[in-house]
Amino acid sequence: MKKTGWGILGAVAAFTGYAYWSTKHLTVTDYEIVSDKIPAEWDGATFVQLSDLHSASFGLYNNPLLSIVNELAPDAVFLTGDMIDGDESPYVAMAVVRKLAKEFPVFYVSGNHEGRSAFYEDFKADMEKHHVTVLENERYFLKKDGAAIMVAGVRDPRFVRDDWAEKELPKEVWEEAALKEALDDATANLSPDYFTILLSHRPEFWPLYQAYPIDLVLSGHAHGGQFRLPLTEGLFAPGQGLMPKWTAGIHRAGGKALIVSRGLGNVTKLPRLFNDPEIIRMTLRAKGDA
């Protein structure tokens, strides 16, 4: 074989090896959230966000993933949907969530994959049995030394697809309408004085979230845009299509913030490129009077 042929084979092998390695190389991304609505008692509190596991495994029994979370020692763990993968067995995700719930308060919202899974009710029942707070268009007070912040969560619109089918609306229209109903329920009579975190799987509705008394939104779903290239938000994301806007990182508007997790697992045959699986840690900072 000519040298050129060997070179091509070597490049393909190296690319394939990198693509596989990058799907298993867990990274931790840190964000600091500063607000004058964060009580002094919550200054320095940390939370971990995990999203889009899709029943993936990172080492034996997911111990490498769990070890990282344990080392971060957060005040709570937020799961922002697609922990299970469609109609695949939920047992990998169940095992991860059970172990997390032994160590930390865990809050969960569903994603579109739970919305189409025949196993979701079993998964939900198992989470609740292990004291996970499943948020379905509702909110929860988190208290520390008598001071409270709010965690709200909405069920993914995929759960109500059949309710909207007869109206024959475009997918993006009925999904936004369904999500608006969920947000209305989750934030009904919510005082804007509370620092409020919203768990909602879908980042493409960031403009909608801004209309509510919410300070920080945590989402996933976009898988980091699948292929991450410089100066882009990736090449493709579900719900956003080609050249999406919100696939990773922190986005700010009107005094509010959206954090989008790149997620953990993968649901396509295409590899994640320059897009390592991500664990997010956020630290709250109380902004005192000047």
Predicted feature residues:
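Short, Asp-centered acidic motifs that coordinate Mg2+ and/or phosphate
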Residues: 75-76, 107, 132-133, 149, ...
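Catalytic metal-binding/acid-base residues of hydrolase active sites
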Residues: 54, 84, 113-114, 139-140, ...
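Conserved beta-sheet core of the metallophosphoesterase superfamily
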Residues: 197, 202-280
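Short, flexible loop segments at the rims of nucleotide/cofactor-binding pockets, characterized by
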Residues: 53-57, 83-87, 173-176, 195-196, ...
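Membrane-embedded segments
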Residues: 41, 45-140
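Beta-strand-turn-beta hairpins that frame and shape the catalytic cleft
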Residues: 35-48, 139-156, 252-258, 284, ...
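N-terminal membrane-anchoring alpha-helices
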Residues: 1-41
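Binuclear metal-dependent hydrolase catalytic cores centered on His/Asp/Glu-rich metal-binding motifs
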Residues: 129-131, 144-196, 206, 272
